[in-house]
Amino acid sequence: MTLPPLSHLDRLEAESIHILREVAAEFRAPVMLYSVGKDSSVLLHLLLKAFAPSPPPIPLLHVDTRWKFREMIAFRDRRAAETAVDLRVHINPEGVAQDIGPISHGAAVHTDVMKTQGLKQALEQGGFDAAIGGARRDEEKSRAKERVFSFRNARHRWDPKNQRPELWNLYNARTKPGESVRVFPLSNWTELDIWLYIYRERIPVVPLYFAAPRPVVQRDGAWIMVDDDRLPLHPGETPQLRSVRFRTLGCYPLTGAIESTADTLEAVIAEMLVSTSSERQGRMIDHAPGASMEQKKLEGYF
């Protein structure tokens, strides 16, 4: 009997499911980082598929900065209830005590304390030896050269000059005491692949990815959504109601929207087919001096 050939998305799906099962088999205490974005939504869907009909043996971890869009938090809690996954939420208590935020302390300090340090705290407290994430190689140049199994030392630091070879679909999961591994099952996916898979599988995503009239102000060439009253307005600044959507989601004062009328999956995919800009163009932290993705990863960022 001749089996029909696998489609491009079928091959990507099979590869990702293989990686997830490999992690479950090789590591003592793996965890999946759930940032609530489109890549995390795809990763959660794959995790559920990989171990169906049983519940996934890998818990989810969300490192909450207290500055995520309100729709993201509502979506996170709703999906956790719908899928009955083991979702754990960590907020850096030291950051809370100092009331660290992107406006009061700046983007670099906020990202380091609430994201990087918060992530390291959560991994250490949970005793996790592998953390699965939804990063893709097409997102950013430092991620383009990272392995699927990315090894970190006892301080969670990444050494891009000291990576293990990965031959075909063979992964080396051995670690020394104190070391851990970041695993990226979506490494070979593109942004368009993600949206095509979401469309094919009908995966729920945060409504912020779809265009709608939203209150925004323009700062440094980016449309920043006024999500709550913590965002101080500049003198003479008045929020405008514009049809915008987000290609990437993070802390709302640091995430720029794009003007768009794409309010359906089909329209988003059509927009993606003609886009010539990076999806991370709206991440304000990427443009800060000395805040390159590689530098953040060297310090323990995901």
Curated annotation (Swiss-Prot):
Entry-linked InterPro entries: PAPS_reduct_dom, Rossmann-like_a/b/a_fold, SO4_adenylTrfase_ssu, Sulfate_adenylyltrnsfr_sub2
CDD domains per UniProt: Sulfate_adenylyltransferase_2
Any matching Pfam family: PAPS_reduct
EC number: 2.7.7.4
Pathway: Sulfur metabolism; hydrogen sulfide biosynthesis; sulfite from sulfate: step 1/3
Catalysed reactions, as listed in the record: sulfate + ATP + H(+) = adenosine 5'-phosphosulfate + diphosphate
GO biological process terms held by the UniProt record: hydrogen sulfide biosynthetic process; sulfate assimilation
Coiled-coil features, chain-numbered ranges: none
Enzyme class: transferase
Gene3D superfamilies for this protein: HUPs
Keyword annotations from UniProtKB, A to Z: ATP-binding, Nucleotide-binding, Nucleotidyltransferase, Transferase
Molecular function terms from GO: ATP binding; sulfate adenylyltransferase (ATP) activity
Signal peptide: none
HAMAP family given in the database record: Sulf_adenylyltr_sub2
Function of the molecule: With CysN forms the ATP sulfurylase (ATPS) that catalyzes the adenylation of sulfate producing adenosine 5'-phosphosulfate (APS) and diphosphate, the first enzymatic step in sulfur assimilation pathway. APS synthesis involves the formation of a high-energy phosphoric-sulfuric acid anhydride bond driven by GTP hydrolysis by CysN coupled to ATP hydrolysis by CysD.
NCBIfam families xrefs: CysD, PRK05253.1, PRK12563.1
Similarity comment: family membership: Belongs to the PAPS reductase family. CysD subfamily.
Subunit structure: Heterodimer composed of CysD, the smaller subunit, and CysN.
Protein name per Swiss-Prot or TrEMBL: Sulfate adenylyltransferase subunit 2
Origin species: Xanthomonas campestris pv. campestris (strain ATCC 33913 / DSM 3586 / NCPPB 528 / LMG 568 / P 25)
Gene label: cysD
